[in-house]
Amino acid sequence: MKSLYVAFGGALGAVSRYVISKFINSSFSFSFVPWGTIFVNVVGSFLLSFLMFLSISKTDISQSFILFFGTGFLGAFTTFSTFAYEFLSIFLTQPLRAIIYFIANIFLGFFAAILGMFLGRGRIL
């Protein structure tokens, strides 16, 4: 049963990532970087960190929900492989732009995860 929670969450997360990323990238086709990938990675980093730190302080969050939403949905919603591919594709022709994309993705993702940790714990420090 646990595998089904992950599978269903993963299916929804993958489709959500595809739709959101395509919408954002087509809305900002003139953009300097692929904002769709940055968006899903940053939002996913925040939500997963928030969920996991909240689950530490609140024992009433079910393991089934964590498997469905954390492991399944957010695991498929975020995408390291697309980030790596896009970075390398950009790097081949525009190395400086690729490095900016890399730094933005990592920095914003970790910032979002730290914010999620603080909010999930319910306190700043």
Swiss-Prot record:
Transmembrane helix recorded as keyword: yes
Lineage top rank: taxon: Bacteria
Segments traversing the membrane: 36-56, 65-85, 99-119
Location(s) in or outside the cell: Cell inner membrane
Mode of membrane association: Multi-pass membrane protein
One BP annotation, GO: cellular detoxification of fluoride
Main location: membrane
Protein name: Fluoride-specific ion channel FluC
